[in-house]
């Protein structure tokens, strides 16, 4: 099973979201821990991956050899890619 590692700022951003949104994102991340490549999509021209949770996006790096999902960004889809 993969481990989740958050950038400190992104963990703070996640905790600032409304409870319902935060729980939905957290549940999706827990589901991804078994096989993240099933849920995450690779970003074009980048080594990062994205996960869609409704209108919210999670940008992460996935290290298969170490079995780590490193969360780089959490945000609304209109703001996340800028």
Regions found by a protein language model. Give the residues of each.
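A short, surface-exposed loop/turn module that caps and links secondary-structure elements
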Residues: 27-52
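Enriched for short, Lys/Arg-rich terminal
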Residues: 1-23, 53-56, 61-82
């Amino acid at each position: 099973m993969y481990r989740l590692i958050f950038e400190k700022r992104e963990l703070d951003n996640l905790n600032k979201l409304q409870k319902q949104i935060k729980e939905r994102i957290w549940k999706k991340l827990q589901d991804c821990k078994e096989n993240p490549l099933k849920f995450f999509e690779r970003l074009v021209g980048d080594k990062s991956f994205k996960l869609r949770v409704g209108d919210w996006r999670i940008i992460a790096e996935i290290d298969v050899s170490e079995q780590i999902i490193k969360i780089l960004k959490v945000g609304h889809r209109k703001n996340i890619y800028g």
